[in-house]
Each structure stands twice: as C-alpha cells, then as structure tokens.
Amino acid sequence: MRDGVRNYIVYKVDGNAHGHQTELWALLLDPTGMNTVGSPEMILKNDQEWEHGIVEGQWFVKVGNEFYLFYSGCGYANDCYSIGIAKSSSALGPYTKKAQNPILRTRSPMTAKSW
C-alpha cells in the first residue's frame, strides 16, 4: 500500500486456519521498500458476525486524507463470501468498520464455488 509518500506492507495473520482470530496487520517500509520501520500495527480483526471468523483480501484506496480499507469476510469457498469497508485517517489505523457491512454480498453458491 502507498499513501502517496510512504510504502506499507499489509498482511493477514491466518488465525482462522487454527481456530483463532483472524487479523490484518500493517507495517511501514523504508524508502527502498526492502526494510521495515517500527513495529507492525493490527489494523483489523474479525469481530462482526457476517465475517464468520475471517477477514482477508484487503485493498486500500486513499481519498483526500482518508484511507478506505476494503476486505473480504466469510472465506472465498463459501456462498457467504462478502466485502466490507473500514475507514481511517492513518494508514496504520485505527480503522472503523462501516456499520452497514457487508457492502457487497454473495447471493449465489455458483458465484463463490465456480472453480
């Protein structure tokens, strides 16, 4: 992710694979993009019922001074796979989830399981 000046790496801690909380973390990179700066920050965790224990597939859009974090919940192989959004004034959070999440919801089992 890039905020216009700085680069970040954003990653998922796959807790759902082990029956634990799933988290998204962000870490600032140096100008070369090859080294980290500081400590990672947890920016999102699965805490809404529709997510079914999973947050993943994160991507960001910066509009003005706000960061919009789009993410998927419920797992790609399920017909409940959906997209949520959270907002922050800082790339490293904290992010606030939209109360009306998910903003897009899978309705057909064929959509999620077409592979």
Go through each PLM region and give its residues.
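Carbohydrate-active catalytic/glycan-binding domains of CAZyme proteins
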Residues: M1-W115
